[in-house]
Amino acid sequence: MANDLFAFVGTYTRLGSEGIYTLKMNGNTGELEQVSLATGIENPSFVALDPSNEHLYAVCEVGDQDGSGACAAFSINQATGDLTPINQQSTGGPGPCHLMVDGSDSLVIATNYAGGSVAVLPINDDGSLGERTEFIQHEGSSINPQRQEKAHAHSVNIDESNTHAYVCDLGMDKVFIYDIDHENGKLNPSQQPSVDEVAGQGPRHFTFHPSGKLVYVLNELGCTITAYHLSANGGLSPIETVGTLPDDWEGDNTTAD
Protein backbone atom coordinates (compact mmCIF):
# COMPACT_ATOMS: atom_id res chain seq x y z
CA MET A 1 0.00 0.00 0.00
CA ALA A 2 1.12 3.57 -0.62
CA ASN A 3 0.79 4.33 3.09
CA ASP A 4 3.13 1.54 4.17
CA LEU A 5 6.58 2.48 5.44
CA PHE A 6 9.73 0.50 6.19
CA ALA A 7 11.73 0.73 9.40
CA PHE A 8 15.22 -0.70 9.82
CA VAL A 9 16.32 -1.90 13.25
CA GLY A 10 19.96 -2.38 14.20
CA THR A 11 20.88 -4.83 16.94
CA TYR A 12 23.67 -6.46 18.92
CA THR A 13 24.18 -9.95 17.53
CA ARG A 14 26.33 -10.84 20.56
CA LEU A 15 23.17 -10.57 22.65
CA GLY A 16 21.14 -13.03 20.57
CA SER A 17 19.80 -10.96 17.69
CA GLU A 18 20.68 -11.93 14.12
CA GLY A 19 21.37 -8.72 12.20
CA ILE A 20 19.37 -5.81 10.75
CA TYR A 21 15.60 -6.33 10.81
CA THR A 22 13.29 -4.74 8.25
CA LEU A 23 9.84 -3.92 9.61
CA LYS A 24 6.86 -2.77 7.56
CA MET A 25 4.53 -0.30 9.23
CA ASN A 26 0.94 -0.18 8.09
CA GLY A 27 0.25 3.50 7.50
CA ASN A 28 -3.42 3.10 8.39
CA THR A 29 -3.21 1.00 11.55
CA GLY A 30 0.35 1.60 12.76
CA GLU A 31 0.94 -2.14 13.01
CA LEU A 32 4.51 -3.40 12.53
CA GLU A 33 5.40 -6.61 10.73
CA GLN A 34 8.86 -8.10 10.27
CA VAL A 35 9.38 -8.67 6.56
CA SER A 36 13.09 -9.48 6.20
CA LEU A 37 16.41 -9.88 7.99
CA ALA A 38 19.91 -9.02 6.82
CA THR A 39 22.41 -11.38 8.42
CA GLY A 40 26.15 -11.81 8.10
CA ILE A 41 26.97 -8.58 9.91
CA GLU A 42 28.22 -8.47 13.50
CA ASN A 43 26.68 -6.03 15.99
CA PRO A 44 25.01 -3.57 13.57
CA SER A 45 24.07 -1.44 16.57
CA PHE A 46 23.39 1.78 14.66
CA VAL A 47 22.11 2.33 11.11
CA ALA A 48 21.51 5.39 8.91
CA LEU A 49 19.95 6.01 5.50
CA ASP A 50 21.39 8.10 2.68
CA PRO A 51 19.42 11.20 1.56
CA SER A 52 17.77 9.28 -1.30
CA ASN A 53 16.75 6.34 0.93
CA GLU A 54 18.36 4.00 -1.59
CA HIS A 55 21.20 2.81 0.64
CA LEU A 56 21.61 1.94 4.30
CA TYR A 57 24.86 2.15 6.24
CA ALA A 58 25.53 0.33 9.51
CA VAL A 59 28.31 0.22 12.05
CA CYS A 60 29.83 -3.15 12.93
CA GLU A 61 30.48 -2.53 16.61
CA VAL A 62 33.34 -4.95 17.08
CA GLY A 63 37.02 -4.81 17.97
CA ASP A 64 38.73 -4.71 21.33
CA GLN A 65 41.37 -2.16 22.26
CA ASP A 66 43.75 -3.59 19.66
CA GLY A 67 41.26 -4.38 16.91
CA SER A 68 39.04 -2.31 14.67
CA GLY A 69 35.42 -2.22 13.67
CA ALA A 70 33.83 -1.44 10.34
CA CYS A 71 30.97 0.20 8.49
CA ALA A 72 28.79 -1.78 6.10
CA ALA A 73 26.85 -0.62 3.03
CA PHE A 74 23.55 -2.11 1.82
CA SER A 75 21.20 -1.39 -1.07
CA ILE A 76 17.49 -1.17 -0.26
CA ASN A 77 14.82 -2.85 -2.37
CA GLN A 78 12.24 -0.07 -2.62
CA ALA A 79 9.34 -2.50 -3.04
CA THR A 80 10.14 -5.05 -0.32
CA GLY A 81 12.55 -3.32 2.05
CA ASP A 82 15.05 -6.16 1.64
CA LEU A 83 18.69 -5.24 2.24
CA THR A 84 21.43 -6.50 -0.08
CA PRO A 85 24.99 -6.21 1.25
CA ILE A 86 27.42 -4.24 -0.90
CA ASN A 87 30.67 -4.07 1.07
CA GLN A 88 32.38 -3.22 4.35
CA GLN A 89 35.29 -0.93 5.20
CA SER A 90 37.34 -0.63 8.38
CA THR A 91 36.85 2.41 10.60
CA GLY A 92 40.43 2.10 11.83
CA GLY A 93 39.45 1.88 15.50
CA PRO A 94 37.56 -0.42 17.86
CA GLY A 95 33.89 -0.20 18.74
CA PRO A 96 32.25 2.05 16.12
CA CYS A 97 28.89 2.98 17.62
CA HIS A 98 27.45 5.81 15.50
CA LEU A 99 27.56 7.17 11.95
CA MET A 100 25.99 9.81 9.74
CA VAL A 101 25.69 10.25 5.97
CA ASP A 102 26.44 13.79 4.84
CA GLY A 103 23.83 15.81 2.97
CA SER A 104 25.56 15.48 -0.40
CA ASP A 105 25.54 11.67 -0.12
CA SER A 106 29.31 11.58 -0.58
CA LEU A 107 30.68 10.73 2.87
CA VAL A 108 29.99 8.54 5.89
CA ILE A 109 31.41 9.86 9.16
CA ALA A 110 31.68 7.31 11.98
CA THR A 111 32.74 7.44 15.63
CA ASN A 112 34.72 4.67 17.33
CA TYR A 113 33.61 4.62 20.96
CA ALA A 114 36.15 2.15 22.32
CA GLY A 115 38.96 3.73 20.34
CA GLY A 116 38.00 7.37 20.92
CA SER A 117 38.40 8.25 17.25
CA VAL A 118 36.56 9.53 14.18
CA ALA A 119 36.72 8.11 10.64
CA VAL A 120 35.53 9.36 7.25
CA LEU A 121 34.63 6.90 4.48
CA PRO A 122 33.78 8.11 0.95
CA ILE A 123 30.62 6.84 -0.76
CA ASN A 124 31.10 5.61 -4.32
CA ASP A 125 28.54 6.07 -7.12
CA ASP A 126 27.15 2.56 -6.57
CA GLY A 127 26.63 3.19 -2.85
CA SER A 128 29.66 1.18 -1.78
CA LEU A 129 32.11 2.54 0.77
CA GLY A 130 35.66 3.45 -0.16
CA GLU A 131 38.70 3.23 2.08
CA ARG A 132 39.13 5.78 4.85
CA THR A 133 40.11 9.27 3.78
CA GLU A 134 40.32 10.60 7.35
CA PHE A 135 41.12 9.26 10.81
CA ILE A 136 41.27 11.51 13.87
CA GLN A 137 42.35 10.19 17.25
CA HIS A 138 41.02 12.07 20.27
CA GLU A 139 43.36 12.23 23.28
CA GLY A 140 42.24 13.00 26.82
CA SER A 141 40.12 11.96 29.79
CA SER A 142 37.92 13.38 32.55
CA ILE A 143 36.94 12.73 36.17
CA ASN A 144 34.95 9.46 36.05
CA PRO A 145 37.59 6.70 36.40
CA GLN A 146 35.31 3.95 35.07
CA ARG A 147 33.79 5.72 32.06
CA GLN A 148 36.13 8.62 31.33
CA GLU A 149 39.58 7.04 31.59
CA LYS A 150 40.23 7.95 27.94
CA ALA A 151 38.53 9.45 24.92
CA HIS A 152 35.22 7.84 23.89
CA ALA A 153 33.79 9.43 20.72
CA HIS A 154 30.11 8.56 21.05
CA SER A 155 28.21 10.23 18.19
CA VAL A 156 28.47 12.52 15.19
CA ASN A 157 25.93 14.97 13.76
CA ILE A 158 26.06 17.15 10.64
CA ASP A 159 24.42 20.57 10.44
CA GLU A 160 21.78 21.55 7.89
CA SER A 161 24.31 23.51 5.84
CA ASN A 162 26.35 20.31 5.47
CA THR A 163 29.51 22.18 6.45
CA HIS A 164 30.12 21.21 10.08
CA ALA A 165 30.35 17.89 11.93
CA TYR A 166 29.86 17.75 15.69
CA VAL A 167 31.33 14.86 17.68
CA CYS A 168 30.30 14.19 21.28
CA ASP A 169 33.18 12.66 23.25
CA LEU A 170 31.85 11.13 26.46
CA GLY A 171 35.31 10.35 27.83
CA MET A 172 36.67 13.88 27.43
CA ASP A 173 33.53 15.90 28.32
CA LYS A 174 33.86 17.75 25.02
CA VAL A 175 31.91 18.38 21.84
CA PHE A 176 34.35 18.67 18.93
CA ILE A 177 33.48 20.86 15.94
CA TYR A 178 34.93 20.05 12.51
CA ASP A 179 34.66 21.76 9.13
CA ILE A 180 33.87 19.16 6.45
CA ASP A 181 36.09 19.09 3.36
CA HIS A 182 33.79 17.19 1.00
CA GLU A 183 36.18 17.21 -1.95
CA ASN A 184 38.98 15.46 -0.07
CA GLY A 185 36.95 13.59 2.54
CA LYS A 186 38.67 15.39 5.42
CA LEU A 187 37.66 16.96 8.74
CA ASN A 188 39.44 20.14 9.82
CA PRO A 189 39.16 21.77 13.26
CA SER A 190 36.61 24.55 13.05
CA GLN A 191 37.13 28.17 14.10
CA GLN A 192 35.87 26.99 17.51
CA PRO A 193 37.52 23.54 17.69
CA SER A 194 35.52 22.28 20.68
CA VAL A 195 33.30 23.20 23.60
CA ASP A 196 33.74 21.86 27.14
CA GLU A 197 30.93 20.25 29.09
CA VAL A 198 30.90 20.35 32.91
CA ALA A 199 33.31 17.68 34.18
CA GLY A 200 31.67 14.28 34.59
CA GLN A 201 28.61 14.97 32.44
CA GLY A 202 29.62 12.60 29.62
CA PRO A 203 28.13 14.04 26.38
CA ARG A 204 26.57 11.22 24.36
CA HIS A 205 24.13 12.44 21.69
CA PHE A 206 23.41 15.74 19.95
CA THR A 207 20.43 17.13 18.06
CA PHE A 208 19.48 20.34 16.25
CA HIS A 209 16.43 22.48 16.96
CA PRO A 210 14.21 22.89 13.84
CA SER A 211 15.01 26.63 13.85
CA GLY A 212 18.66 25.86 13.13
CA LYS A 213 19.70 28.27 15.88
CA LEU A 214 19.85 25.92 18.86
CA VAL A 215 21.32 22.52 19.65
CA TYR A 216 20.86 20.12 22.54
CA VAL A 217 23.47 17.74 23.97
CA LEU A 218 22.35 14.74 26.00
CA ASN A 219 24.80 13.99 28.81
CA GLU A 220 24.75 10.27 29.63
CA LEU A 221 26.61 10.27 32.94
CA GLY A 222 25.14 13.46 34.38
CA CYS A 223 21.59 12.64 33.22
CA THR A 224 21.27 16.19 31.92
CA ILE A 225 20.62 18.10 28.69
CA THR A 226 22.70 21.15 27.76
CA ALA A 227 21.26 23.75 25.38
CA TYR A 228 23.54 25.82 23.14
CA HIS A 229 23.16 28.72 20.74
CA LEU A 230 24.39 27.73 17.26
CA SER A 231 26.19 30.59 15.51
CA ALA A 232 26.36 31.21 11.76
CA ASN A 233 29.95 29.95 11.68
CA GLY A 234 29.04 26.72 13.47
CA GLY A 235 30.21 27.72 16.94
CA LEU A 236 28.39 26.79 20.16
CA SER A 237 27.59 29.03 23.15
CA PRO A 238 26.07 27.39 26.27
CA ILE A 239 22.67 28.57 27.49
CA GLU A 240 21.73 26.23 30.33
CA THR A 241 21.91 22.66 31.57
CA VAL A 242 18.81 20.96 32.98
CA GLY A 243 18.33 17.61 34.68
CA THR A 244 16.27 14.72 33.35
CA LEU A 245 15.52 13.19 36.77
CA PRO A 246 13.39 14.30 39.73
CA ASP A 247 15.27 16.47 42.23
CA ASP A 248 14.92 13.81 44.93
CA TRP A 249 16.30 10.97 42.76
CA GLU A 250 18.96 8.96 44.63
CA GLY A 251 19.48 5.84 42.50
CA ASP A 252 21.91 5.11 39.70
CA ASN A 253 20.89 6.24 36.23
CA THR A 254 22.24 7.08 32.79
CA THR A 255 20.53 8.72 29.81
CA ALA A 256 20.72 7.41 26.25
CA ASP A 257 18.82 9.33 23.56
Describe the residue ranges of each PLM region.
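Blade-loop segments of beta-propeller domains
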Residues: 34-105
